[in-house]
Every structure is written in C-alpha cells, then in structure tokens.
C-alpha cells in the first residue's frame, strides 16, 4: 500500500517521539550496540580520560544507561530554556540543584578543580550552562551577570539562533548579519569579570568575530562543525575557528544530525570524525573538543522541544524524512555510531582508527576544555 504524505509524516513523527521522548529498550539497545566491538585500547583510554561533554540537556536526578555508558567526567548542561526570562531561568537552576542533591553520583561544578575531583571520586560533574542570554537583565548587566555567576552559571552565549540585545544569532545573519552590539561588548566584559565562559555556538558570523576580538580571555564554540564540510547556518567558517584558536579557545565537534549532513550522505560516526580531523588540521589538536548535543536523561524531553522537532520533520528535505524513506527506522533520529553521549567509547575507537595518539585523544576528550575553564572561571 502506498502511504500518503500525511501518513508518512505521522510515521516519522512517531519515530522521532520514540527516540527523543521515551526511554525505550529498542533505542537503548541500538545505541549501545555501536559500542560492542571497540578495541581494548579504546576502552582503556576512555576509562582513564577526563571526558567533558560541553553540550547536553534535560538532566534528571539519577544516573541512567546513557550516562553510565558515556564515562563522562563532566557535562555542560543547558539549564534555562533558550528564550527564558530571569524568573524561568531561576526555576531551572533550582531544578538542577535538586537533581544534583538527589543523586550521590552527581557533583556540582563551580571551579575547574571540581572536574578533576569528580574524576577521582567516580562522580559526574554538572556544569551549569545556557544556550541563550535573554534571562540577563539588560539594564544592569554587570550585577545581573554576577548574580547568575554566584548561582553557578559557568557557560553562556551572546545569542541563540536569532537576535538578542547582545548580537545576532546564526539564523538572523540570513537577513541582517549584524555585529556585536554595545550591550554585547559589556556582556562579554561582565562575563569575563564574573568567571563565565563565552560560548559562540548558535551565534552569527559577524557577531562571533566581533566577540572574539572583544574577548580578553579564551572564548569557545561548545558545539559547532566546519561549514567548509557541512554548509549549514549553525556551522562556523574557517576564519572563526582560526580566530577562536588564536585567543586560546576550543571548538567542540557536535553530533546533531542536521549540521553533519552534506545533503547526500546520512550523518554518522564517519562524518563526525571528518569534522574532527578537519578542525584538528586547521587549528590544531589543542583547540578541539566535543559537545555531543544530546539528552542526558533519555525520556526527559520537554513537550515544547518535542513539538519543535516534530515540526522540523515535516519536510521532504529533512534528514528524518529522507532517512525514513531509505528504510532506516530509528536511525532517522540519530547518527549511526554517535547517537548520544553514550557513544564516547566508540568515538575513541574511531579516533584511534584515524591515527590519533593517546595524548591527542585525551586533549580532545576533556583536557582542552579543562584548560579553558581554568583560564575563564574563578578558580
């Protein structure tokens, strides 16, 4: 029987919900299967390394199969929603404090040494970050930023996809491509003074470059890929990556499918590795990290986020649609081999296959991020 477009879209939305919104055995088994045949050397390096994932979200008050498999030492968690105001943001911070209090395996991270201690203690460090800055009071930036820093905020961008008081997001540049505003310059100065790392993922080209020139400490792209390989507005130019490295920053390779898609080959671990190798060749191993961009707690996806992803799937140009039509089922919602943070050991295995040395692997897994946090946080 031939399915109508409406029936196809409904089936794709169902698959997306199954992957994103439920802690299903089928999804767990699919994800963990990619870790089964990794080498003993990869497992050893994975176990010994400090691993920092600089983009995750929806952490709840307990560990789970994905976190246990990840081996992560610390997670940079998106705490406020991308468009939350100050009140909503505060509620989100309270929720994360509760999550950490509810689980002995979690450790709140305030300074870089807390990450080192988490490794020694066999715990998972929780870094409070954001993917927006709308919750900051614009009329008193220094005091507002200091207040959120005292609450625990450690990573924050100057925009998320669209325009803010500080500058343009990556999608706003399609029409305006404005630069960093005067308030944006003040925001960066306030963040540096209060010990918050400046993140430029989701930020527009011109605003990002302005921010890199305005920064006096390392700034980062927590989860972005090379636009030269994958021409997507969310990815960054060679010029941005080079400037980021020039001031001591780090670019995190991201597994989010749309920004690893060249329009022809379905995203997978090889495309993820291509992005990593590209940036290592361009700016050096010392300036590359990993920001997976996946759920820390499978099944915890917020309703509004689920609706957003369902909307993304309603296009014949979407990865999910083309993947479904190719008979890939669950794989329409993820990258083969690097579906989530649960696949860090598989990443290590592929890094070895690509010729990375153990020291280089450990830098990329977490030591580069640790260096930046030492330089940008109050330690």
Q: What positions do the PLM features span?
A:
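N-terminal hydrophobic targeting/anchoring segments and the immediately downstream early-domain regions
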Residues: 1-159, 164-175, 231-241, 245-247, ...
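Active-site core of metal-dependent hydrolases
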Residues: 173-262
């Amino acid at each position: 029987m031939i399915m109508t477009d409406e029936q196809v879209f409904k089936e794709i939305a169902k698959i997306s919900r199954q992957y994103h919104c439920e802690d299903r055995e089928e999804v767990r088994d699919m994800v963990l299967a990619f870790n089964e045949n990794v080498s003993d050397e990869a497992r050893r390096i994975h176990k010994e390394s400090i691993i920092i994932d600089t983009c995750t979200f929806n952490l709840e008050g307990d560990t789970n199969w994905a976190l246990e498999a990840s081996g992560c030492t610390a997670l940079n968690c998106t705490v406020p929603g991308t468009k939350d105001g100050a009140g909503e943001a505060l509620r989100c911070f309270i929720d994360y404090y509760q999550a950490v209090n509810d689980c002995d395996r979690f450790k709140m991270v305030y300074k870089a040494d807390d990450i080192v201690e988490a490794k020694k203690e066999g715990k998972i460090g929780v870094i409070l970050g954001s993917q927006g800055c709308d919750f900051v009071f614009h009329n008193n930036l220094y005091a507002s930023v200091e207040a959120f820093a005292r609450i625990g905020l450690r990573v924050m961008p100057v925009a998320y996809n669209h325009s803010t008081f500080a500058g343009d997001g990556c999608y706003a540049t399609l029409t305006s491509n404005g630069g960093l505003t005067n308030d944006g310059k003040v925001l960066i100065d306030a963040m540096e003074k209060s010990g918050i790392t400046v993140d430029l993922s989701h930020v527009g080209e011109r605003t990002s470059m302005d921010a890199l020139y305005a920064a006096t400490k390392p700034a980062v792209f927590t989860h972005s890929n090379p636009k030269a390989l994958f021409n997507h507005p969310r990815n960054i130019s060679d010029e941005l990556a080079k400037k980021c490295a020039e001031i001591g920053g780090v670019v995190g390779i991201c597994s989010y499918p749309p920004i690893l898609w060249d329009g022809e080959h379905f995203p997978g671990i090889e495309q993820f590795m291509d992005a990593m190798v590209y940036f290592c060749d361009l700016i050096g191993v010392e300036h590359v990290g990993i920001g997976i961009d996946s759920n820390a707690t499978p099944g915890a996806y917020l309703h509004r986020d689920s609706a957003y992803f369902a909307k993304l799937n309603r296009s014949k140009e979407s990865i999910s649609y083309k993947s479904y039509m190719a008979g890939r089922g669950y794989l329409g919602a993820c990258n083969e081999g690097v579906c989530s943070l649960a696949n860090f050991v598989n990443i290590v295995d592929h890094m070895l296959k690509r010729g990375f040395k153990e020291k280089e692997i450990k830098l990329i897994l977490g030591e580069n991020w640790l260096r930046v946090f030492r330089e940008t946080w109050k330690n």
